[in-house]
Structures are given as structure tokens and as C-alpha cells.
């Protein structure tokens, strides 16, 4: 009788081998994987392959992110080819070796975040707003899933599909984390369709890099920052809901992640979920398609803190608004915290249902404005320090004086200067910054740059049809041009990630993130990519002045 685990590993090895081979072929639909991508792919372990789904385990969180955002599409396609039917993919994190249990010292009281502020009127660091009482007001965490039975035999192909891939990954994660000592590998059980909702606290929806400690405070965002801290310290007791609005690229998303991360430090076990409105909408649509409405409700209503980014994108989606209305009510009535962000205040979300807008207005509404000069310089100093880049203050002042409306635009300018410095292998100077920013410097006389203009210019530059550039073709030349256009949309427009994805045939926001990161990296390593960005930027600006 054959070993099912050996057969599983052999099948997975064949999938990986095929993928790596395809990535090396010149005319393949699979891109040429980088060294780190190949390494992460080879470190993945198969956990379960079922009827149209697969669960794999990455060795750590960074590898999981790479697999999901950069390689997931190609892995899914290869698995589907090997299985002879469409396949969905779920990724979890392999459990580390369990140390022997030992008595833990009592945890110290959590400290308030130490935050960076822009100097104001020569007074240096300011006292943070919203000082809250120190007594514990932790809300009762929502009910946890039942402990799995680790003594049942592992089933490598379940009798039926799990209620959702998220629940499949979560079920495995809980098996690993709760396995008793003496069991080096948790044995699995088949997953019943009506399993309790998975633990959002473990789904890693929060970006650990976004914290209050690295959020630069100035007069334009101090109140919003203080409100977010207060909500993290006292969920559902300070301000509920908290509604943060402001233009794209000003730090709203950073504050939402920071609040979630800080709340989990203060209140271990708190169930926190961050989603964009696009993700909420897609989850809801998929639950209708797959007849998983109850699973969807458990996932979003069995929480202590729900954060929804860019809530304005619910406009025009009547059925999704209806579901979010009921989700909002369920959480609010259960005394659970809700944090929302938008590019406009509630009153200006005119196509949202009145009952939603009135609920948004029932808590605290605070805005974030474009940062002042000193705050912009402080942001650039923080960014340069985080990237390990040595930049003279005069260069930072030059950049800060030219880019006023968006933090994303500000940091993009610094990235372009740093990339040019790496390419020419010279230290950053004022003269170099002037050269690097020549085509990027904003012109107040320019009309607003649109994604359509960027796509049209990029298609013409590479002699590609516009529909092809917007489409899903995987040829390297087309994929590279599309990634350049996505990067420029991110840098030159105020569009959010979901809106940029919409301009490219409805691509997911993670595809835009991948393109942005890939081109940023290539700009520091490949002169051709840097020159392409410079040339395209100039053409877009010329096109915009017609």
C-alpha cells in the first residue's frame, strides 16, 4: 500500500519542477522567477490536496506573502493542470518546533507607542493627544473555535470541500498551535462544513510594518492619530465608529493598521480584521456564488474590531451595502469596534444609503490633511532611515518643497532619487536630485493626470494595443509594460489600489502592489527600467498638456 504523504510530496515536487522549468523558457506565460521567489517556492510544503482545492504551508510570514501575492496565480494554474480540474489555493504558515513548556514571567504592562512628530514652532516633540485611563477595559474576546481532535488520522484528500479555503488554512493553523507536546506534527481531521468561523486574529490581515511608532505626526494628522490610539486602547468605548477621511496617500491606511496592531498588543486574543471595501465586496459576492452566506456572516460578525478601508467604494453596490449595514449593526449592538476610512466625509458619500451615512456620522469623524513642510521633511527622514539611505537634509528639503499633496508622491520622489544614485554609483547630492526629479516635478499648470493617459502612452511607447495592456496576457514584454503603467498610476495619480486595478481589466489590488514593488526594485538595479520610467513620465506629462 503506497504512502499517501509520499505521494502528496511527489505530486507537489512535480508541480514545482514544472513551474521552475516554465519560468526559464523565453516565450513562457510564466515570468522568470527571481532567486528569492524560487527559494520561497522550493521551501513550501504541501499539506492537503482535495477535490478542487489545495493547502500548502510556507516557512514564515514573508514567504507566505510572496507565495500569495507574487506566485499564487502560477501555482494555482499549475495545480489545475496537474489535477485536471480547476483548483483553488490556500496558504498557511508551517508551525515552528515546539519548545518544552516553561513557566513564563508575568507580562509587563504595555507601553504607549513612542511616536515621531514633526517639530512645531521650535518646541520639538509634542504631548500625544487623548491620554486614556490606565485601568484595563479590554472587551471580552469573541468566542473561539473548538479545539480540534489531534488523534484522528490525517486525511490528505477530504471527502468534501471545506466551508472555505480560509477555514481550511485556519483549521490547519489551529491544529499546529494547539497540538499537545510529544506530537511533533499535529494530525488532522476532516473539516465539517459548519465549522465555527476562523480566527481573524491569525489571518495576518494587518501589516506589521504600519505602527504608531513609525507614523510621523504633524498638525495635519495629530487629531486623527490621537483618535486611533484611543480606540486601540479602549475598543468600542472611546469612539465607535471612528471615521477617518482624507485624500489618497495621506496615511489613512497606515493608521488603520497601526490601531489594529496596537490593540492586539494591549489586548492579546482580540479578534481584529482589516479589509478594503473591495475585499469585503469580493468576499460577499463569493459567498453568494458558493452558497456560503453563513460562513461569511460568522467571519465578519464574530470580531472585536473590524476595519474597512476606502468605504466610499461601496457606492453603487446596493446588495453589498445591504450586507454591510447588517454587519455594522451586528457589531455595534454587540459593543464591538468599527473603524472606517474614506476619501470624503460621510455627508459627501451621496450615493450611499442614508441609513449607512447616518450610522457613520454617529461616532467620531476626523480628517487627515496634506502635511506641512516640516512634517514632509520628517516623513522623508523617517523613510530614508528605514531604507538605510544616507541623504543630506538639503536634498530632503528640496523634495519636500516640491511635493506637497501626497505622502505617497513624496516617498516616490525619494525612491526615484535613491534609485538613480544606485544606478550611477554616486552619493546623493542636490545636483543629482535635480536630475532625477526633472521629469517628475509637479507643474501646477498641468491638468490632472489620468490612468487612461498613462495606459495610452505606455501602450504607444511599447507598440502594444491598449486592450492588450489592460488585459491578462502573460508574455513578458506585455507584463513588463503593464507593471510599468501600474507603477506610474500609483506614482502620478491619486487613485487607490482597487481603482488602479479596475483600470487594468479588474485586476486585484495585490497585483498592483506586486507591480509597484517590482518596478521600484528594478529601478535600483536595471538602468533600462529606470530610463523607461523617466521616458514614460515625460511622455505622460507632454500628453497631459495637449
Curated annotation (Swiss-Prot):
Task: Provide this UniProt record's keywords sorted from A to Z.
Answer: ATP-binding, Cytoplasm, DNA replication, DNA-binding, Lipid-binding, Nucleotide-binding
Q: Where is the composition biased (Pro residues)?
A: 96-111
Q: Where is this region: Domain III, AAA+ region?
A: 205-421
Q: Where is this region: Domain II?
A: 85-204
Q: Which InterPro entries match?
A: AAA+_ATPase, Chromosome_initiator_DnaA, Chromosome_initiator_DnaA-like, Chromosome_initiator_DnaA_CS, DnaA_C, DnaA_dom, P-loop_NTPase, Trp_repressor/repl_initiator
Q: Which GO terms describe its cellular component?
A: cytoplasm; plasma membrane
Q: Where is the composition biased (Low complexity)?
A: 126-145
**Segments for region (Disordered):** 96-209
Cross-referenced Pfam families: Bac_DnaA, Bac_DnaA_C
Task: Return one GO MF term.
Answer: ATP binding
Biological process GO annotation list? DNA replication initiation; regulation of DNA replication
| Gene3D superfamilies per UniProt | 1.10.1750.10, 1.10.8.60, P-loop containing nucleotide triphosphate hydrolases
- Which stretches does the entry tag as region Domain I, interacts with DnaA modulators? 1-85
Which of this chain's residues are annotated to bind ATP?
A: 249, 251-253
Which portions of the sequence form the region Domain IV, binds dsDNA?
A: 422-546
UniProt cross-references to PROSITE patterns, sorted A to Z: DNAA (PS01008)
Compartment(s) of residence:
Cytoplasm
Q: Does the keyword Cell inner membrane apply?
A: no
HAMAP family per the record? DnaA_bact (MF_00377)
| PANTHER family according to UniProt | CHROMOSOMAL REPLICATION INITIATOR PROTEIN DNAA (PTHR30050:SF2)
What this protein is reported to do is described as: Plays an essential role in the initiation and regulation of chromosomal replication. ATP-DnaA binds to the origin of replication (oriC) to initiate formation of the DNA replication initiation complex once per cell cycle. Binds the DnaA box (a 9 base pair repeat at the origin) and separates the double-stranded (ds)DNA. Forms a right-handed helical filament on oriC DNA; dsDNA binds to the exterior of the filament while single-stranded (ss)DNA is stabiized in the filament's interior.
> What's in the domain note?
Domain I is involved in oligomerization and binding regulators, domain II is flexibile and of varying length in different bacteria, domain III forms the AAA+ region, while domain IV binds dsDNA.
Query: What is this protein identified as?
Result: Chromosomal replication initiator protein DnaA
